[in-house]
Amino acid sequence: MDGNGRWANERGLPRIEGHRRGADAVKRALKAAQENGVKIITLYAFSVENWNRPKDEVDALMQLLDRFLKDQLTELVKRKIRLRVVGRYQELPEHIRERLSHVEAATAKFTDYTLALALNYGARTEVVDAARAIAQAAQAGKINPDELDYEQFAQHLYTKDLPDPDLVIRTSGEARLSNFLLLQAAYAEIYFTPVLWPDFDEKQFKLALTDYAARERRYGQTAEQLQG
């Protein structure tokens, strides 16, 4: 979800207006995902580094998030989409935590479609938190460090109940992952587009899926092995 600020700057608008338009793009992405049979969509809404932005922008982002969740609850329930939050949930403002908890509880029964919001998320922070939890479990005798494998490690990630992504879409022309799902995206296909997030619509979503469908996913194997 990158490019909101640049979108606004290019039009001589306040940065928060770019974020508002970005929220509209979220609604389009959810609609496009369902229409194309995408069961789980994870949106990088707020990173641990985003706290370094000007305070007025951070405050405005939190207000926008609160309003978005309030306005979209009925729509999520109507379309049977579960909300799942990944990140350092406990460090968000109290009113945001309460809103998120309410929406998560109201949509918890839905299983066909999931909107995962990465909030106060950072992949490196996630790894540190997982390592800390594993160390505590090992100290308590619940885990044997010598038997630890990736599957066990993954059970301590924020995304422990979500599958690894098949496709990562990076908007705004940036060619990097920016600390997003670094472990989980190890075998994901990555699609880069110059389109700024507020302009990312159903057509752009479909283009990304079409590009993904044309790729050959090898998982370390040769093309000959995949062909049987």
What do the predicted segments below correspond to?
Residues M1-G228:
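Flexible, compositionally biased loop and terminal segments
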